[in-house]
Amino acid sequence: MCGILAVLGCSDDSQAKRVRILELSRRLKHRGPDWSGLHQHGDNYLAHQRLAIVDPASGDQPLFNEDKSIIVTVNGEIYNHEELRKQLPNHKFFTQCDCDVIAHLYEEHGENFVDMLDGIFSFVLLDTRDNSFIVARDAIGVTSLYIGWGLDGSVWIASELKGLNDECEHFEVFPPGHLYSSKEREFRRWYNPPWFNEAIIPSTPYDPLVLRNAFEKAVIKRLMTDVPFGVLLSGGLDSSLVASVTARYLAGTKAAKQWGAKLPSFCVGLKGAPDLKAGKEVADFLGTVHHEFEFTIQDGIDAIEDVIYHTETYDVTTIRAATPMFLMSRKIKSSGVKWVISGEGSDEIFGGYLYFHKAPNREEFHQETCRKIKALHRYDCLRANKSTYAWGLEARVPFLDKDFIKVAMDIDPEFKMIKHDEGRIEKWILRKAFDDEENPYLPKHILYRQKEQFSDGVGYGWIDGIKDHAAKHVTDRMMFNASHIFPFNTPNTKEAYYYRMIFERFFPQNSARLTVPGGPSVACSTEKAIEWDASWSNNLDPSGRAALGVHVSAYEHQINPVTKGVEPEKIIPKIGVSPLGVAIQT
């Protein structure tokens, strides 16, 4: 994948404008260090920074149809491109690049071809015959994309905010699963799955083999590559299943013939972190070539400004988790690996976050999963995309495969609910689907390991260390006046205030701050789910430890010595235990 920048309908076609667009495109160079390109057609500019994964030799962009009347710049991976080529027998392709099909599909089907694409993508397509254009983003928003409007009437498209924020009067997140047409001058949704209507509660019975097969297909199709790759392996359920399925099926792929059947795996954490221990155990079980990266709290703190610049957010949960991922991505890229397969999306689909223990019924459980999936592009998708692309590393996420989501979201949510009296913990149906006694995918205790949020699993001292650091830079007086300084998404903790100050230095525009989600949350819940328990209403910390009793000791005993002199109640949340045994921050 890559970084894209397009300026459409610009009133200035001078050389100076071209130079400026090249300058802005270079702000995205980290996303595509292998090659860059800029195509100008009249008052339209399409720029591209390429990370070459498929057909590195001839897949440079922009891409064209036969007579070059259709021009495409795209950030994406089209997993069914070979099947689509077979449906276009009368077309000539200039490259083997998977995204080469887009221009030709448009020629055949007009604007209504986007749902034919199986993959992740953000693209701009310019039809020079009538000077019209379309822009589209993948179903869930795995790829990042923004749209802006200039005072001269131009439309700007960029993979990251930093490509357009200094030039546009207004800009916003390009909505996932949508297409923007210059002819209609509006967005329209091309992705319309049944679960988008939250009022419709699915009733399909749970079939473990159907779920297992759907996930295996999602992983296998993502092994399309002409360059070395690896897997992120924290030792949690999601990354372990991804690694297990990848290792199991890698030998029969073209990738194995090129790069060998030994799968590289990667894990990051503080010294002694839960993830390092569990990741090593899973790697030994699967026989991967495992790499561990230890970081210190100071390493993470030193990286926070870079993390905020690259992730373009001030959301607390995202920054906490993105920092170790950012550090690990640099190490991975230096090893020669160009992309990794990762486990994002499972918790949203299956209700894996620990607050789902309190879901009152199947209807509200399902509706919350719908809300969580719809918001992924602002949270985990953003983190996984931008913290890896900061170093020119691509992340692929099989749990967010369109076909797999359909299978998983069609299941009656009654089967997903946590039921202690029946021995069902969070994500029980996913665990059960891969519980194979004869040919085990994972060790039993790993398969049934309880949920750890990434920012917790890398080491409980990490979050406490950030809070300590923020407390030294944000005073009580600053917090007292926070609502006047930041009236939108007012930070309610010193950590949040610290992140916000950094974000505003990089992205001071009002449009920029509006791209970041806000509102109260407990252990990553949506605001609506807080209604499930009255004691959650005063929650200030989105960490998973705010909803899990076994983590109380981490809050009590892992405080960094630098907090000396800071009142503990300002740093450490108070924990109460609910009747379900779930610790809730109060």
From Swiss-Prot:
Site-annotated residues for Important for beta-aspartyl-AMP intermediate formation: E344
Keywords, in A-Z order: Amino-acid biosynthesis, Asparagine biosynthesis, ATP-binding, Glutamine amidotransferase, Ligase, Nucleotide-binding
Entry's Gene Ontology cellular component terms: cytosol
Biological processes annotated in GO: L-asparagine biosynthetic process
Enzyme class: ligase
Reaction(s) catalysed by this chain's protein: L-aspartate + L-glutamine + ATP + H2O = L-asparagine + L-glutamate + AMP + diphosphate + H(+)
GO function terms (MF aspect): asparagine synthase (glutamine-hydrolyzing) activity; ATP binding
Enzyme Commission code(s) on record: 6.3.5.4
Pfam families: Asn_synthase, GATase_7
Induction (free text): By darkness.
Superkingdom: Eukaryota
Reported tissue expression: Root nodules.
Official protein name in the record: Asparagine synthetase, nodule [glutamine-hydrolyzing]
Domain Asparagine synthetase: from-to ranges: 193-517
Chain residues that bind ATP: L232, V268, S342, G343
Keyword Nucleotidyltransferase included in the entry's annotation: no
Domain named Glutamine amidotransferase type-2: residues: 2-185
Residue sites binding L-glutamine per the record: R50, L51, A52, I53, V54, N75, G76, E77, D98
Active-site positions on this chain: C2
Pathway: Amino-acid biosynthesis; L-asparagine biosynthesis; L-asparagine from L-aspartate (L-Gln route): step 1/1
